[in-house]
């Protein structure tokens, strides 16, 4: 049925696309996405606080490499929220589109492999972002 025929039939046009599990693409719904975004916020606040503390106490610039941890946590949270994909769930072979807590198992082996690969990419990207920001912080003249 074409879009014109669908509209002419008097049925309302669809306004949103349902989000569902897609191997290696999407494994979390709105509640889990919000949780990942909050983790990103917490990591960002911790990163700024740690940098401020290290500068305030006059710690040697090399100590700013500690920023890799909270920055990686922040990057991981934001990446997972943006991508609608939980790295931890992907590594465990589970997904959740409902309320926080209950999860469902991924049954297909090929789907699990795609999820694990995506999880690894998110983890590596998060660490890379953390390392890059930490190195820049070490080089800051403050």
Model-derived regions: residue spans:
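Membrane-interfacial helix-loop segments of redox and metal-homeostasis proteins
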Residues: 2-142
């Amino acid at each position: 049925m074409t879009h014109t025929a669908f509209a002419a039939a008097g049925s309302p046009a669809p306004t949103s696309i349902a989000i569902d599990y897609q191997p290696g693409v999407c494994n979390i719904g709105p509640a889990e996405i919000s949780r990942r975004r909050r983790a990103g916020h917490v990591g960002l606040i911790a990163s700024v606080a740690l940098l401020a503390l290290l500068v305030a106490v006059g710690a040697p610039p090399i100590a700013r490499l500690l920023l890799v941890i909270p920055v990686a946590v922040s990057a991981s949270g934001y990446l997972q929220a943006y991508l609608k994909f939980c790295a931890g769930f992907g590594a465990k072979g589970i997904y959740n589109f409902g309320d926080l807590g209950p999860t469902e198992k991924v049954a297909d082996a090929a789907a699990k492999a795609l999820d694990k690969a995506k999880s690894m990419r998110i983890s590596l990207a998060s660490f890379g972002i953390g390392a890059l920001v930490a190195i820049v912080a070490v080089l800051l003249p403050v």
